[in-house]
Amino acid sequence: MSESQSEFPGGGTTGDIVRTMQEAQERAAVLAQALPFLRRYAGDTIVVKYGGHAMVDDSLSNAFGHDIALLKLVGVNPVIVHGGGPQISAMLTRLQIPSTFVDGLRVTDAAMVDVIEMVLAGKVNKQVAGLINQAGALAVGISGKDGGLITARRLQRTTRDASGQERALDLGFVGEPTHIDPRVLYALSGSGLIPVVAPVGIGEAGETYNINADTAAGAIAGAVHATRLLMLTDVPGVLDETGALIPELTAEEARRGIASGMISGGMIPKVETCLEAVRSGARAAVILDGRVPHACLLELFTEAGPGTLIRGE
């Protein structure tokens, strides 16, 4: 046996020991590079909208749970707002309740909103909190109704009929936030816990509203003056006309991108959510690819984040 392959009492070879040391040195270098970022975000609140492929892929969801636990461990205060569209659709199909969508929003009657609340607040919410708990942190699942977190009203939308006349759309119990009371989030975060929020709100008369998770996350990020709103999506971020990722936009540049058509389709409401978040108090918002493992850590703790950052004025 050559010297490079000689065995040590523990059973490893010289090559094994060298590789182990190299890997350890690489990990140490990564930690050292992250130190300035750890200092930058210590004590800050980061709101994460969790959904899309990152939520249904086991490997990505487990990595997400560990990443959020790590954020809390290093002094960041994460607040998670999750979606659950596929899980809602599956339950409605199982119950033989048909779904109708208008502009990507599920028309929600009184019976359906009960099912949606059951799935979001009762099932998905606890699954997401469980991922974080399994990673060693302490997460608590709540809905927007708890502690009066999200007060909502019926979402107002209009459309034009075949004759060109504008008419109001009745989306049922689809809501939009009118007020965010973050005290329950502060109480949980201040006690060392990680809030995990199901996007369900309560109306002035006590009625329940189904709220788009992006919209809920943006409203919460603004209300808590989050340092970052991280929007996990199934796309790399905002792309230019050539298909290249745009790493950063000012709010004005983002608005011009929408007006010019560079930002189009399903990216428009995501960018508008980011704009509303930074307008109402968040320092910056990031649309990033949740299909990339450890996307949140890469965005916060490296120079080259994997998404598009939108800053306020």
Swiss-Prot record:
Keywords tagged on the record: Amino-acid biosynthesis, Arginine biosynthesis, ATP-binding, Cytoplasm, Kinase, Nucleotide-binding, Transferase
Binding residue positions for substrate: G84, G85, R106, N210
UniProt KW Nucleotide-binding keyword: yes
Entry's EC annotation: 2.7.2.8
Site positions (Transition state stabilizer): K49, K270
UniProt GO molecular function: acetylglutamate kinase activity; ATP binding
GO cellular component: cytoplasm
Pathway terms, separated by semicolons: Amino-acid biosynthesis; L-arginine biosynthesis; N(2)-acetyl-L-ornithine from L-glutamate: step 2/4
GO BP term, pick one: arginine biosynthetic process via ornithine
Short name of one Pfam family: AA_kinase
Reaction(s) this enzyme catalyzes, per UniProt: N-acetyl-L-glutamate + ATP = N-acetyl-L-glutamyl 5-phosphate + ADP
Superkingdom of the organism of origin: Bacteria
Subcellular location: Cytoplasm
Function: Catalyzes the ATP-dependent phosphorylation of N-acetyl-L-glutamate.
Entry's family note: Belongs to the acetylglutamate kinase family. ArgB subfamily.
Record-given protein name: Acetylglutamate kinase
Organism: Gluconacetobacter diazotrophicus (strain ATCC 49037 / DSM 5601 / CCUG 37298 / CIP 103539 / LMG 7603 / PAl5)
Gene that this sequence comes from: argB
